[in-house]
Curated annotation (Swiss-Prot):
This is Large ribosomal subunit protein uL22. InterPro entries: Ribosomal_uL22, Ribosomal_uL22_CS, Ribosomal_uL22_euk/arc, Ribosomal_uL22_sf. Keywords: Ribonucleoprotein, Ribosomal protein, RNA-binding, rRNA-binding. Part of the 50S ribosomal subunit.
């Protein structure tokens, strides 16, 4: 029996929502947490524009938790440190577009959608080994991330 996909967001009884999830995406969990914190409670079009600007390296994502040895950005207002996590932003944008398609299928008003729930959780670690000199090997592990997005009408 397959495990049922559970969301950490529990909607109200009369709330119309659309959900989408990405499982075991090969992106950084730390970058994903920072992006999700930034786009939470944004309108759908604003979040898509923000992620496209991050991919084009026009907008900086503020790093508020995982910010050790992260450089300061002059174009970032209100917070000193930030980065351009392009790979994570592209993966989250795909999940966001999937949620938008699900909202259209649920006949929600796409112009008035808001991100009511966005979260990133650590997924499984894909173990790997890199051969080294003298018969040794060093671990080269790939972290994965689970993304959950829930859209609701504002």
């Amino acid at each position: 029996m397959a495990k049922k996909n559970t969301y950490s967001y529990q909607p109200k009884a009369d709330e119309k929502i659309a959900k989408a999830a990405g499982h075991s995406l090969k992106i950084s969990p730390k970058h994903s947490v920072e992006i999700c914190r930034t786009i939470r409670n944004m309108y759908l079009e604003d979040a898509k524009a923000f992620l496209e600007d991050v991919i084009a390296k026009k907008t900086v994502v503020p790093f508020k938790r995982h910010n050790k040895k992260v450089g300061h950005r002059s174009d970032l207002k209100g917070w000193p440190s930030g980065r351009y996590p392009v790979k994570a932003a592209a993966a989250i944008l795909k999940v966001l577009e999937n949620a938008e398609a699900n909202a259209e299928n649920e006949e929600l008003d796409v112009e008035n959608l808001k991100l009511v729930h966005v979260c990133a959780n650590r997924g499984v670690i894909i173990r790997g080994w890199t051969p080294r000199a003298f018969g040794r090997a060093s671990p080269s592990n790939t972290p994965t991330t689970h993304i959950q997005i829930v859209l609701g009408e504002a």
